[in-house]
């Protein structure tokens, strides 16, 4: 995984630096579509087939996306295919999104709860998280995982806060076993 991140970083940085601030959202949307395609086993098999040229693969993928690729992303896709780096596109999209969020003073927050969070409970949680992270705009992704038993698990960047019952039970088990 670290190797893929290392491969992806220069590509993500190059695309990010070439895009104007107004183009970032569109580039990210197109990158995410390409990432979904790159993750398909059939597309991976095509990209590894020596009989399929980089140009043909780029044309095929450009035709498969819902959104027409703009010039920067189309050139980027061609470069990726010429360098046989299609497998890195999901990680490139992830890093591009992180760069976009950083430039906008925002952060992705992943909230996993044992039960659905709605209304005031969700708003209160987001409000306290916003204070904790210096007033950054938070872009939440909310998931429900009943195996947590109770509580929430929150991840912002590389920081994880886990107040779930499952985590507390694991801590107790570890301390009793020691």
Curated annotation (Swiss-Prot):
Q: Which UniProt keywords apply?
A: ATP synthesis, Cell membrane, CF(1), Hydrogen ion transport, Ion transport, Membrane, Transport
Which parts form a coiled-coil structure per UniProt? none
- Specify whether Zinc is a keyword of the entry: no
Keyword Cell membrane (UniProt): yes
Gene3D superfamilies, alphabetically? Answer: N-terminal domain of the delta subunit of the F1F0-ATP synthase (1.10.520.20)
User: Tell me, what is one Gene Ontology molecular-function annotation carried by this entry?
Assistant: proton-transporting ATP synthase activity, rotational mechanism
CC annotations in GO: plasma membrane; proton-transporting ATP synthase complex
User: Where located?
Assistant: Cell membrane
Q: Which InterPro entries match?
A: ATP_synth_OSCP/delta_N_sf, ATPase_OSCP/dsu
Major subcellular site? membrane
Q: How does it sit in the membrane?
A: Peripheral membrane protein
**Family, per entry:** Belongs to the ATPase delta chain family.
Which HAMAP family would you find in this protein's record? Answer: ATP_synth_delta_bact
Q: What is its biological role?
A: F(1)F(0) ATP synthase produces ATP from ADP in the presence of a proton or sodium gradient. F-type ATPases consist of two structural domains, F(1) containing the extramembraneous catalytic core and F(0) containing the membrane proton channel, linked together by a central stalk and a peripheral stalk. During catalysis, ATP synthesis in the catalytic domain of F(1) is coupled via a rotary mechanism of the central stalk subunits to proton translocation. This protein is part of the stalk that links CF(0) to CF(1). It either transmits conformational changes from CF(0) to CF(1) or is implicated in proton conduction.
Q: How does it assemble?
A: F-type ATPases have 2 components, F(1) - the catalytic core - and F(0) - the membrane proton channel. F(1) has five subunits: alpha(3), beta(3), gamma(1), delta(1), epsilon(1). F(0) has three main subunits: a(1), b(2) and c(10-14). The alpha and beta chains form an alternating ring which encloses part of the gamma chain. F(1) is attached to F(0) by a central stalk formed by the gamma and epsilon chains, while a peripheral stalk is formed by the delta and b chains.
Q: What is this protein called?
A: ATP synthase subunit delta
Species in which this protein is naturally found: Polynucleobacter asymbioticus (strain DSM 18221 / CIP 109841 / QLW-P1DMWA-1) (Polynucleobacter necessarius subsp. asymbioticus)
Classification lineage? Bacteria, Pseudomonadati, Pseudomonadota, Betaproteobacteria, Burkholderiales
Gene symbol here is atpH
């Amino acid at each position: 995984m670290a190797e893929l991140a290392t491969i992806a970083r220069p590509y993500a940085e190059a695309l990010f630096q070439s895009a104007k601030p107004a183009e970032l959202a569109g580039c990210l949307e197109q990158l995410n579509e390409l990432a979904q395609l790159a993750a398909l086993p059939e597309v991976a098999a095509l990209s590894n087939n020596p009989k399929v040229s980089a140009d043909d693969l780029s044309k095929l993928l450009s035709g498969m996306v819902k959104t027409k690729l703009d010039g920067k992303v189309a050139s980027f896709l061609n470069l990726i295919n010429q360098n046989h780096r299609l497998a890195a596109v999901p990680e490139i999209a992830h890093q591009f999104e992180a760069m976009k969020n950083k430039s906008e003073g925002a952060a992705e927050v992943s909230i996993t709860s044992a039960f659905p969070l709605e209304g005031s409970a969700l708003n209160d949680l987001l409000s306290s998280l916003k204070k904790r992270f210096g007033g950054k705009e938070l872009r939440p992704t909310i998931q429900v995982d009943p195996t947590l038993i109770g509580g929430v698990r929150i991840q912002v960047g590389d920081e994880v806060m886990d107040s779930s019952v499952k985590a507390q039970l694991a801590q107790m088990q570890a301390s009793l076993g020691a």
